[in-house]
Amino acid sequence: MARAVGIDLGTTNSVVSVLEGGDPVVVANSEGSRTTPSIVAFARNGEVLVGQPAKNQAVTNVDRTVRSVKRHMGSDWSIEIDGKKYTAPEISARILMKLKRDAEAYLGEDITDAVITTPAYFNDAQRQATKDAGQIAGLNVLRIVNEPTAAALAYGLDKGEKEQRILVFDLGGGTFDVSLLEIGEGVVEVRATSGDNHLGGDDWDQRVVDWLVDKFKGTSGIDLTKDKMAMQRLREAAEKAKIELSSSQSTSINLPYITVDADKNPLFLDEQLTRAEFQRITQDLLDRTRKPFQSVIADTGISVSEIDHVVLVGGSTRMPAVTDLVKELTGGKEPNKGVNPDEVVAVGAALQAGVLKGEVKDVLLLDVTPLSLGIETKGGVMTRLIERNTTIPTKRSETFTTADDNQPSVQIQVYQGEREIAAHNKLLGSFELTGIPPAPRGIPQIEVTFDIDANGIVHVTAKDKGTGKENTIRIQEGSGLSKEDIDRMIKDAEAHAEEDRKRREEADVRNQAETLVYQTEKFVKEQREAEGGSKVPEDTLNKVDAAVAEAKAALGGSDISAIKSAMEKLGQESQALGQAIYEAAQAASQATGAAHPGGEPGGAHPGSADDVVDAEVVDDGREAK
């Protein structure tokens, strides 16, 4: 049975994990790291770089490098590169393809099935966009799982049979979630979840960038925001400073040649940022995590003293101010330090993949929908059919009627959110039910059914009870991608995968050819410079020289088959040279032996290693017969 992987598709970094003998293993990428930067770059030579290679060239290729694309999932955002538009699911698919390749290299087999995580507070549009990204990457997405739920699954499964309440505080690179779960006897049940899809480590970085821009403007009078390369260097320096301030009280930010003044003299940025100053300029961001926490506690109706464990998820929770706030909110409870905040979500996703594949037994995951779902009714009111924190999958129906006499159709507008006025919530989609027979208002009965699947994706049906006519919508407007769009993107992704494979093959062949040319040239040079001259005829060496020249000429072009052919010919000539050297050495040895027989000078000494003695191998302690 083909294996399934668990993928944490993060804003800043992504991780892939797989079950090995029932235990989750985090897969290292081709660069040797267990986390892959969620960055995609389009090099000017047409190559698509993903992960650390993309991050390494970001400063010199700002306009063609995409980071934090997760923040655009479910929107109509796109970026144009070389005249072609790329949507957020397409960019995310590049990251997923890289993780897929790394997992396949580790396992030595093809991967198609995956469980992908999303922030718990992602709406339907964002979940659908994530599923589309998986599909474009060539993955069969078994399930979309909430990140805090995956973390609790990874943390809580081995904590015994006793029922426990776990609070997961998840602050990542771009999103924030807090969830309260109950775990016991193999059942993982989410009681409530809340969050902010636009709050994460990126925002802390931006505050440091703004602080540096203001400081530099104050000392030099130059506004760095107009210089894209300078801003990219500031972003990287800000992230580094934030990380350093988690373990130090202050950090130096030194960026030489950040820009030039009016006289073209180079200017340097050199600032000292203390942890106290960093916490001061980011305090309001930290305070934004309080409301979702309080919302979860209120929704579950339990007190903080009843929480058994607090689990921190996401790299941003390493900031001391975040840890201190969590301790304050939970009444002094010490957060659990036994999990890796960068990897625990992917580990939980791999466990859920194991559950769905039957590798992990006796585990039931009960997740919830993070936001209420409903339709717009008369007066623009949001009428909820499914309340937030309802366990999924779920199905709810409610009967509505017409607002006007002889109304021939009804427009069903589906919203997600907590506001009382429908227009203030997120419009997921709309559809029309037509063919309603003429009747006074209030007489027709229209049954509206909401069905949320295990991925948290919504299906809505409207049915006229009188005629039996019905219409259904599967909410897809969020990603803005039709089936045709997705199919086209899958083909594009496959084409790029083939291009990438060819590029890798070409690089391997070139490397082999260059190595062979270098070694052969060195060998020929040694022969010509040998004491007493070369042992082989000059015409043999000339043939090798010609083959080397042919290989160099092929390497100067782009025809991979010509390089292979030249390398093959050079290999043959090199072998012929080796054979000639061996034969020359053998002939010289025989000539020397004939001139100096026995123990004479130049001959073999009696008892030397050249004497051959017949003997039997015998066990120790026994005589030879």
Curated annotation (Swiss-Prot):
<dbReference type="GO" id="GO:0042603">
    <property type="term" value="C:capsule"/>
</dbReference>
<feature type="compositionally biased region" description="Low complexity">
    <location>
        <begin position="586"/>
        <end position="598"/>
    </location>
</feature>
<dbReference type="GO" id="GO:0051082">
    <property type="term" value="F:unfolded protein binding"/>
</dbReference>
<dbReference type="GO" id="GO:0035375">
    <property type="term" value="F:zymogen binding"/>
</dbReference>
<dbReference type="InterPro" id="IPR018181">
    <property type="entry name" value="Heat_shock_70_CS"/>
</dbReference>
<dbReference type="Pfam" id="PF00012">
    <property type="entry name" value="HSP70"/>
</dbReference>
<dbReference type="GO" id="GO:0005829">
    <property type="term" value="C:cytosol"/>
</dbReference>
<dbReference type="GO" id="GO:0001968">
    <property type="term" value="F:fibronectin binding"/>
</dbReference>
<dbReference type="GO" id="GO:0005886">
    <property type="term" value="C:plasma membrane"/>
</dbReference>
<dbReference type="GO" id="GO:0009986">
    <property type="term" value="C:cell surface"/>
</dbReference>
<dbReference type="GO" id="GO:0061077">
    <property type="term" value="P:chaperone-mediated protein folding"/>
</dbReference>
<keyword id="KW-0597">Phosphoprotein</keyword>
<keyword id="KW-0964">Secreted</keyword>
<comment type="function">
    <text>Recombinant extracellular protein activates expression of NF-kappa-B in immortalized human dermal endothelial cells in a TLR2- and TLR4-dependent manner. Activation occurs via MYD88-dependent and -independent pathways and requires TIRAP, TRIF and TRAM (some experiments done in mouse cells, mice do not usually catch tuberculosis).</text>
</comment>
<protein>
    <recommendedName>
        <fullName>Chaperone protein DnaK</fullName>
    </recommendedName>
</protein>
<dbReference type="InterPro" id="IPR012725">
    <property type="entry name" value="Chaperone_DnaK"/>
</dbReference>
<dbReference type="GO" id="GO:0031072">
    <property type="term" value="F:heat shock protein binding"/>
</dbReference>
<dbReference type="GO" id="GO:0005524">
    <property type="term" value="F:ATP binding"/>
</dbReference>
<comment type="function">
    <text>Acts as a chaperone.</text>
</comment>
<dbReference type="GO" id="GO:0005576">
    <property type="term" value="C:extracellular region"/>
</dbReference>
<keyword id="KW-0346">Stress response</keyword>
<keyword id="KW-0547">Nucleotide-binding</keyword>
<keyword id="KW-0143">Chaperone</keyword>
<dbReference type="InterPro" id="IPR029047">
    <property type="entry name" value="HSP70_peptide-bd_sf"/>
</dbReference>
<dbReference type="GO" id="GO:0042026">
    <property type="term" value="P:protein refolding"/>
</dbReference>
<dbReference type="GO" id="GO:0009408">
    <property type="term" value="P:response to heat"/>
</dbReference>
<dbReference type="GO" id="GO:0046688">
    <property type="term" value="P:response to copper ion"/>
</dbReference>
<dbReference type="GO" id="GO:0097691">
    <property type="term" value="C:bacterial extracellular vesicle"/>
</dbReference>
<dbReference type="GO" id="GO:0051085">
    <property type="term" value="P:chaperone cofactor-dependent protein refolding"/>
</dbReference>
<keyword id="KW-0067">ATP-binding</keyword>
<dbReference type="GO" id="GO:0016887">
    <property type="term" value="F:ATP hydrolysis activity"/>
</dbReference>
<dbReference type="GO" id="GO:0009274">
    <property type="term" value="C:peptidoglycan-based cell wall"/>
</dbReference>
<keyword id="KW-0963">Cytoplasm</keyword>
<dbReference type="InterPro" id="IPR013126">
    <property type="entry name" value="Hsp_70_fam"/>
</dbReference>
<feature type="modified residue" description="Phosphothreonine; by autocatalysis">
    <location>
        <position position="175"/>
    </location>
</feature>
<dbReference type="GO" id="GO:0140662">
    <property type="term" value="F:ATP-dependent protein folding chaperone"/>
</dbReference>
<dbReference type="GO" id="GO:0044183">
    <property type="term" value="F:protein folding chaperone"/>
</dbReference>
<feature type="region of interest" description="Disordered">
    <location>
        <begin position="586"/>
        <end position="625"/>
    </location>
</feature>
<dbReference type="GO" id="GO:0010756">
    <property type="term" value="P:positive regulation of plasminogen activation"/>
</dbReference>
<comment type="similarity">
    <text>Belongs to the heat shock protein 70 family.</text>
</comment>
<dbReference type="InterPro" id="IPR043129">
    <property type="entry name" value="ATPase_NBD"/>
</dbReference>
<dbReference type="InterPro" id="IPR029048">
    <property type="entry name" value="HSP70_C_sf"/>
</dbReference>
